[in-house]
């Protein structure tokens, strides 16, 4: 399973590194996801949740 936020749907983004000579190489920007237990349909479940979703109170740990 991909490391994608269960609540917000955030996923890693891709782009390029650019050197001083403007050469480009592919890179990815990861997201800060934590594996936490939350209630899903009334039952506890371990899912990947972004740190921002946890801080903003969109989800509550069990």
From Swiss-Prot:
Question: Which GO terms of the cellular component aspect does the record hold?
Answer: ribonucleoprotein complex; ribosome
Disordered, as annotated region: 1-26
Kindly list the GO molecular function terms attached to this UniProt entry: structural constituent of ribosome
InterPro entries associated with the record = Bacterial_rp_bL28, Ribosomal_bL28, Ribosomal_bL28/bL31-like_sf, Ribosomal_bL28_bact-type, Ribosomal_bL28_sf
Q: Name one Pfam family in it.
A: Ribosomal_L28
Any idea which UniProt keywords this protein has? Ribonucleoprotein, Ribosomal protein
GO terms, biological process: translation
Please name the NCBIfam families in this protein's record.
L28
The entry assigns this protein to a family as follows: Belongs to the bacterial ribosomal protein bL28 family.
**Protein name stated in the entry:** Large ribosomal subunit protein bL28
